[in-house]
Amino acid sequence: MFKTVFFTFFFILSALFTVATHANEAKHAIAVGAEQFALYLPQLKNKRVGLVVNQTSLVGQTHLVDSLLAKNINITKIFAPEHGFRGDHDAGAHVKNAVDSKTGIALISIYGKNKKPSAKVLSDVDIIIFDIQDVGVRFYTYISSMHYMMEAAAEQGVEFIVLDRPNPNIAYVDGPLLEPEFKSFVGIHPIPVLHGMTVGELAKMIKGEGWINQARDLKLNVIPVAGYTRTTPYSLPVKPSPNLPNDQSIALYPSLCFFEATPISIGRGTDFAFQVIGYSPVALGEFSFTPRSIKGAALNPKFKNQMVKGIDLRHSDTVGLNLNYLINAYQQLTQAKQLFFERADFMDKLAGTDKLRLAIEAGHSAEEIKQSWQAGLKQFKQQRVPYLLY
């Protein structure tokens, strides 16, 4: 009896160890585009290089800027997207032009008034490298910055290299396709909320579908992620922005970002942003939290220094796009005669259409709403096939 139990226990331990080992091996087998110097360094020789980078642009533990400087690459400009070069600016906070104190290289903001660099700014740039970790959601603005940088490169005859990285939400394609009249910086391309593509794949699609001016003129090179597939698990080594601190927040982001157009808090001003929802005076649940001012993440969060009650989603298994949180909160506030879509225009920009908001206001269920965009998703999935790398 003892021997049988022992061997059963040993077998289970061995199986668990094997699974863990294989998972670790899979993680270590991945080489992001930036790590594959042999595939792009020859292109940079004797060229003036501009980098679109932030805190996620790492080669192992070393920033791409430092890695390239150590290899004597001539970096003339660093272009900073939303949240800044160091990733220490709150969402929507102004990013200023500056000079990097460590390297002396000019920092050019591409978030704010000047989202697309002028011919003058690019006059000393031969090649632009884009290396930023994305999360696979249309309204996450790094892909909008990539769009404008690609367009500027095409117009000025500058080469464009994308050093690809995994998409933590690559398994999901969901949400309405963006309609042209709702185009904005939080949604430029006619793609779903969750597009299931890496930035490299999306760059190929932007060029191939002619979504930028002079798309045919753009010399684009994508360095794929080695050892990566659409089923490869990937945990981000660095938080991609101040309010997406972990894998759980990234998984919930597509579902909770719509609350930004409402009076409801999604936890900005806490250590668990995009992992909770809360409101006052209407209690959305039993969980309570109090947002505080956090420099570089949430200086003036909703309900600053006020306790709100709602739902703790830190241990939920939500993935993809879940509309029930939004629909349930709408019903609770409406019953209490509280205005829900207080920023209706912004809601429609996030959704890429007014149909989602109108359907919620009309009382449609999540299943009915999702059914309404299935034809568009089917068309998109077919359209993207030529551009997929994994």
Language model: regions and residue ranges:
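Conserved functional hotspot residues or short segments at active or partner-binding sites
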Residues: 273, 277-372
